[in-house]
Structures are given as C-alpha cells and as structure tokens.
Design a protein with these regions (language model features):
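Conserved glycine-rich cofactor-binding loop
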Residues: 14-15
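Substrate-binding pocket helix/loop in short-chain dehydrogenase/reductase
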Residues: 96-97, 104-109, 213
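Active-site helix of classical SDR
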Residues: 120, 156, 164
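Alpha-helical segment proximal to the catalytic Tyr-Lys
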Residues: 125, 169-173
Length: 255
C-alpha cells in the first residue's frame, strides 16, 4: 500500500465491503486519516473504533444532491486535501422488470451512479491541484454482464463503469487514477437482503439460494467482504487507470 499517510474517504462505510475497507485501513502502520460516511451514525462510529490515526464521522444520505460536495468540503477543510476515495455506497432491489417503478429506478441510479459522479466531481479540483488522486468505485460483476430481477442495479453498475472509464481518460494527466472493481457475489448484508426477497419469489430457502449463487462463481463459493476490500486497496499503489476488473472467488485475482 502507499508509503505515505493519506487522507481517505470511504462511502458506505457502515457495513459490508465499506466496513471491511475501513477495518483494513485501520491496520495500516501509516495511520491513514480516514473519513467515513453512510446514513447511520452508530455504524460509522463502530467502524472507526480503535483507529490510531485521525478519523471523521460524517453521517449523511448520499442520494441528497448537495451531500457529496458538503462531505468533500468537510474533509478538505479538516485535513487540507483528499487523496483517495472509495465509493462503496450502493443498493439493489430484487424485482421483475414490470414491477420496477420509476421511483425504484431513479433511487437505484441516484445512489449507485449519480452519487459517485457527484463525489468525483467534487473532489476533482483539489486532486488536480495536488496532482494526485485515487478514486476507486466498488462496481459489480453485474456491470459486466446481465442479471435478471435486478434491472436497475445492473443498469446502474454498467453506467458507473462508463463513468470510471471516461473520467480516467480525462484525469490521467493530473496524476488521478479512476478504477472500478467488479466482484462476483459477495457475502454481505445487501446480498442477504436480496436473497430474502428471492426466497419469497421462488419458494427456495436462503441457504439454497446462496448455494445457487456460489455455484455460479469459479471457486464455487461466495467472496468475503475482506477479500474485496483487500483487492480495492491495491488500487492505491497502482498507476493503472480506467479499469473495470473482475474479482472472482477462486484465485482472488483480477481478470
């Protein structure tokens, strides 16, 4: 990982992959400065507990159009800049396409695609000025392939990969990299929530559905949030940009 202390923002930091990213950052001997944001303050407070470096807890709703700018401004005001952002906040709703209302569609696209764009847009001027930045988006294998009953989620992840690729081309000359990580099925609270809905639709148990998803992956199992976090953190040291890299559950390597 980086050889100097960094000022890092993690969105969706209260649980799942975001929480695991924070947990691994806390272990780094460089004592990175860690800002965390999500809706629930108690989850954020728990996430940064035990950190030896400086932390900022910023409870907020990323779907509010004004929030990303306010969060970036807070981090810069507190620490004089921002070096890396892990854009992890996201949501899926399991619905057949005929029941995917405009409200559902707009909410998912807002959180999964528009909010990352707003965070990136807000951080870009500071990163350009300091000629360094790392932006890592936790996308999904659903951004590289189709998946039934999660139309809005799949569309949002395809779109955010387009955002990553375009921004990477534009910002590379400023020392800013923008990359997406596309893990397969990850054992997180969001996955469990989706399986609960699928169980009602299919009549299968949650355990049976977990086995179905695990069988789709090269390793025959679900990824863990820690595995995804470890892969995401590797982007900090890389000069590569514009990538949408698939992480599988067999070798834990990129494709």
């Amino acid at each position: 990982m980086a050889e100097k202390q960094l000022r890092i923002l993690v969105t969706g930091a209260g649980r799942g992959i975001g929480r695991s990213i924070v947990d691994q950052l806390k272990k780094n001997p460089l004592q990175h400065k860690i800002a965390v944001t999500a809706r629930t303050e108690s989850e954020l407070t728990a996430a940064v507990a035990g950190a030896t470096g400086e932390t900022l807890v910023i409870p907020a709703d990323a779907t509010d159009s004004a929030v990303p700018q306010k969060i970036i401004d807070t981090v810069i005001s507190q620490w004089g800049g921002i070096d890396a952002i892990f854009l992890n906040a996201g949501e899926a709703q399991v619905l057949p396409i005929e029941l995917t209302t405009d409200d559902v569609w707009n909410h998912i696209l807002n959180l999964n695609t528009t909010a990352p764009m707003r965070f990136l847009r807000s951080a870009t001027p500071q990163m350009k000025e300091q000629k360094f930045g790392r932006v890592i988006v936790i996308a999904s294998i659903a951004g590289l392939m189709g998946e039934g009953f999660v139309t809005a989620y799949t569309a949002s992840k395809h779109a955010v990969i387009g955002l990553v690729r375009s921004a990477a081309v534009e910002l590379q000359k400023y020392g800013i990299t923008v990359n997406a990580l596309c893990p397969g099925y990850v054992d997180t609270p969001m996955l469990t929530k989706g399986l609960e809905v699928s169980a009602q639709r299919t009549g299968k148990t949650i355990d049976e559905l977990r086995e179905v998803l695990a069988a789709k992956q090269p390793g025959g199992r679900l990824l863990t949030a820690d595995e995804v976090a470890e892969a995401a953190l590797s982007f900090i040291d890389s000069d590569g940009t514009g990538q949408a890299l698939w992480l599988d559950a067999a070798t834990k390597k990129f494709y």
